Amino acid sequence: MKKIRILLWLSVLFLCSSVWSHGKVGSVAKDENLNGIINFPDVKGRLTLISDLHTHSVFSDGHVWPNIRVSEATRNGLDVLAITEHLEYQPHIAQIPHKDRNSAFLEANKAAKGSSLVVLAGSEITREMPPGHMNAIFLEDSNKLLNLDKKNQAEAQRRLKEQSFDVKGRDKNVVDFFALANVWPAEEAVAAANEQGAFVFWNHPMWSSQAKDGVARLTNMHKKFITDGKLHGIEIVNGSTYSEEAFRIAIENNLALIGTSDVHNLIEWDYLTRIGEHRPVTLIFAKDRSKESIKEALFQRRTVIWFKEILIGKEDNLLPLLESIISIESTGYDKGTQILTVIIKNNSSARLQLKNQSRFTFFDSTNLIDLPGNDKVKLRIKTLKKLDNLQLEFEVLNALIAPDKNSRIIVNTKI
């Protein structure tokens, strides 16, 4: 009887544990649904690393713990993640006080142990225009990018009255902290980041809160950063927004093209991965998976953005990627005809829209071909005479090498 009572108590304890416990500290329940995984093939001589270089957690104005960001990244198939908290804007500071601005990175790095995810240390320099918001990644110490001198409080309050920062409904302590931090010149914060060898990029230059017409424009401060070699990239894509003007700025000033989620809530809330949506990502073409190699690739501007169903990149980077994504194979001629069947395969998650620019026409398709991600299509081609080799040229309508210019690709196969 005593044994039965013990077993009953153990059963009750187990049940309570199941009811009250929601996973171990630092863990996230496993999701068996893999629909959100992003994949792109490597290019010749380099790895294609999938990254999100602008995200937030509760250590600034995000709403999840850093381990959630890590879990989301691994579920999406990301290789590289940066959690880039606002240095000057800290709306949760009363609830989550932390003096160390490296906290989010330390928590994320700990959560990523045992996975292949590379977590980069970074922060967001958060200022009024100019220069607006700028991310610095590969930092050694984020604290050195923040300067709070209480002697500047009177100046901070004076500036606060003049600036456009919206204080309505915001906690006064948070606003005062932001104002005081902004007295320290942005040039000093950017210089401090560069002293640590950071890769610095301009965030959401099209953001309507700082560019009322949504048009990205270089200010004199940005121009000087570029001239001095202190600004290395620019967001062409931020969340659901895209800037043609930022794309032009990048091309004209040799800045790396960056696309990010800038996620604050759950990724799944912003991008319904279960129905095929995805976060914007920056593809980085690196020699290996080390931080040193990733950093070298970014400084060499070897990036392509995947945004919605569009690939965006400079031609030197985008063409090799397309050559790895698209492959073609002949299955031979229909018996007694000059109609050739080929299989075109898409080796990536990106749906491609191809327009035929070759001298051949198709037997069962128009010149427009929809090539779904991770899939293949069959084409029947009227070659007019039997060939030993086939060459097709396509314009990729959703691959941009300039704001108004699509990429082209030539594919070959033996018959």
Q: Which residues does each PLM region occupy?
A:
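A metal-dependent hydrolase metal-coordination microenvironment
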Residues: 30, 34-199, 203, 236, ...
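Noncatalytic carbohydrate-binding groove/subsite architecture in carbohydrate-active enzymes
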Residues: 187, 195-223
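Bacterial N-terminal signal peptides
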Residues: 9-17
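Prokaryotic Sec-type signal peptides and long signal-anchor helices
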Residues: 17-18, 109
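Charged catalytic cores and adjacent phosphate/nucleic-acid-binding surfaces used
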Residues: 2, 22-52, 66-70, 132-140, ...
